[in-house]
Amino acid sequence: MKHLFIRILLVAGTLSACTPGNRPVFDDMPGMVSYTYRDSFSKDVAATLDTLQAMGIKDMEFSNLFGTTAAEIRQLLDERDMFCSSFGVGYTDLVNKTQEVAANAKTLGAKYVRVAWIPHEAPFDLSDAEKAVADFNRAGKILKEEHDLTFCYHNHGYEFYPHGEGTLFDYMMEQTDPAYVSFEIDILWTFFPGQDPAALIRKYPDRFKLMHLKDLKKGVEGNMSGGTPKENDVVLGTGQLDLPAILKAAKASGIEHYYIEDESPVYYQQVPKSIAYLQGLSE
């Protein structure tokens, strides 16, 4: 009954939000970051995948193996006609366990390996960026040339301190090798430090391959710390971000996979509403 209600909600949202004759922004259901359902995955991977499958989710970005193995998760995905397109790992594992990371990514069936945090003492500075660039170029080359995997760095807000005529994020874009390093744009962690996600995508249309879909509670002021209370994640379309403008820019770029990420403790209430919002968007 719960799953039936969710499906009815999604259909109702789609019918009410779409304008007849307009093309939906998403032909296929956007994916999901496992971090959204981290508490549930930690208790029961199979049951959590069942929940996501019932909502129409097929595309997964796993940021953790949750006490299982890559092979076990792959089997559970295959049994549900789901797939993992991106595998998120920690910075240290990327650098020191590159081959193990690659093996797990290949077993999962992922095309991308992603890192979402650069260890640093705040504030993030040029020396941090320089080290990350060197590590990303080196690991990215191994992943691409030896395993046909694409490395992506996921921005987290602290990279936008001024540098030269731009920011440290611009520096990282300029100094990383496009053949080996791509990027995943987290739109909340682009907006939070004062940047325009749509403008950033237009500036680097070929470097972004993945996107985290998030929204920030109205009234919350940002900074460059890379952190905000999890309660500030809200249902897509109800916060501060201009989702239609961002997605318009994204659709004209090289972004291939979109993942819903909701860090809120009430994600299970918010995610169905976010899905309905996305399905109701039209071009």
Write out the residue ranges for each language-model feature.
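Active-site acidic/histidine proton-transfer and metal-coordination neighborhood
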Residues: 50, 58-59, 91-182, 268
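N-terminal pre-domain/capping segments
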Residues: 18-112, 282-283
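Histidine-acidic metal/acid-base catalytic patches
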Residues: 3, 21-34, 40-55, 166-169, ...
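A short helix->loop->beta-strand "cap" motif at the edges of active sites that frequently abuts
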Residues: 82, 110-111, 147-149, 252-256
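Conserved beta-strand positions in the central sheet of alpha/beta enzyme cores
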Residues: 61, 86-88, 114, 152, ...
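Sec-dependent signal peptide recognition
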Residues: 2-11
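Acidic-and-aromatic substrate-binding clefts and catalytic sites of carbohydrate-active enzymes
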Residues: 37-43, 59-71, 89-97, 120-124, ...
